[in-house]
Amino acid sequence: MLRTTVGLNRRALLQGAAAIAGLTALSSSAAASATSSGPPHQSPIGIYRGGTQQAHLPALHVHYPHDATVTMKYIREDADEPDGCTVRGDEETVRAELPPGTGSLEMGGVTYGLVQFHWHTPSEHLLSARDYPIEMHFVHQDASGHTLVVGVWVRPGRTNATLGSLYNHLVSECSTADHVGHIDVGALLPRRHTSYRYDGSLTTAPYTEHVQWVMLTDPITASPRQIDRFRTMFPTGNRRDVQDINDRVVLSDRGLL
């Protein structure tokens, strides 16, 4: 949960409120493709700590299950290709799907159901021009179909037991789905939920815009062996290149909590 503990001066508060209002207005619009009018608002982007605007942001209330059964699936982009089962594509990944109603996130009075989470290597979002070995995306949707993605960077360090359980069931391309039980989804998030937030898009086709992005500032850790386990599936990576930020503002409550 995110709570406000430090006051801002009136100018900063007004700037933050205006930026939040703009971000909320965009996210409440009907989903649109990258061909909509105006400059593209695509993801991922490069985030610079000194280039973000600090603001008191709506709290995140995360309700992820601690004993879930997920379905591990390989997501393909070349199903029509004769050699597709042996070729790795940039937009392919392994995805963990959850039954409806299994997990949710509340932000700004709106409830978003957790649909699935997946991984990219190296990370798609950069932090101060640096990438991480892995980035996780937790994909949510509200009752109106609006999308919110929580991103989590993964750095080398201590073993993550939950990640290890999932990576023991990574399914290869063209193989059948695998069901994994007793997954503590909440253990895949850092303890602190400070974040960088901006309006962007899906990072795979059809690159739909007006996606709310919440990149948590703190990474989680995984052992080098766990990281290598996922990387071996995508030796050339499976991330999209960083996109132009254009006229967008990245908000952050880092340092305010």
Language model segments and positions:
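Alpha-carbonic anhydrase
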Residues: 2-28, 32-257
